[in-house]
């Protein structure tokens, strides 16, 4: 079992349409039933499943010597972020100059996507992408691939290795 200590912030309800319809925009942080905030909290994880969430002063008695304990005191622990729209093969073209969309696509995006025909290049580019996503707290993605599907198997393999939640499909441009 692994315990993570830190400041914990999470929402208490699954984001279903029914739950979201009941939230009044200005009331989200006024209604403490909507979220959990623990200044000195602990999350316990066993076999990849969160089994414990609570105040450290209460939970510390449950932590055994053989358990892993990670102290993130003064750090914020939140659920992973979700990137709901990303083009997985365009990492190297992000912020590339382009006067108009077609100019940008033709001069930067389409040429950079050619690299994904090589599994070696795809691994390198996807490695850069995933490092940036994880570094910024993103753990789930909805990714668009080029119409050729080049590198798709590589991205599935890498994201599976990290147990990342992924929805992928190709883009016809």
Task: Give the label of every model feature segment.
Residues 80-84, 141-143, 166-170:
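Hydrophobic faces of well-ordered beta-strands that scaffold small-molecule active sites
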Residues 7, 11, 87, 146:
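Flexible loop residues that form catalytic
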Residues 1, 68, 139-140, 165-167:
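Structural motif
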Residues 1-63:
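N-terminal metal-binding scaffold of metallo-dependent hydrolase/deaminase domains
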Residues 55, 81, 138:
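Gly/Ser/Thr-rich helix-start
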Residues 147, 172-173:
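Active-site-proximal loop/turn and secondary-structure-junction residues that shape catalytic pockets
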Residues 95-164:
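Alpha-helical scaffold segments that flank or form the walls of functional sites
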């Amino acid at each position: 079992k692994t315990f993570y200590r830190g400041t914990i912030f999470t929402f208490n309800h699954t984001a279903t349409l029914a739950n979201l319809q009941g939230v009044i925009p200005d009331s989200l942080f006024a209604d403490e039933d909507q979220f959990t905030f623990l200044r000195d909290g602990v999350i316990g994880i066993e076999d990849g499943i969160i089994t414990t969430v609570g105040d450290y002063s209460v939970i510390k008695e449950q932590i055994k010597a053989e358990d892993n304990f990670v102290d993130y005191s003064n750090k914020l622990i939140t659920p992973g972020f979700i990137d709901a729209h990303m083009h997985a093969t365009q990492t190297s073209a992000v912020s590339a100059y382009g006067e108009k969309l077609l100019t940008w696509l033709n001069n930067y995006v389409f040429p950079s996507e050619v690299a994904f025909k090589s599994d070696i290049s795809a691994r390198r580019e996807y490695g850069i992408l995933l490092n940036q996503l994880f570094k910024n707290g993103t753990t789930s993605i909805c990714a668009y691939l080029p119409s050729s599907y080049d590198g798709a198997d590589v991205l599935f393999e890498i994201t599976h290795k990290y147990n990342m939640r992924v929805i992928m499909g190709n883009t016809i441009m």
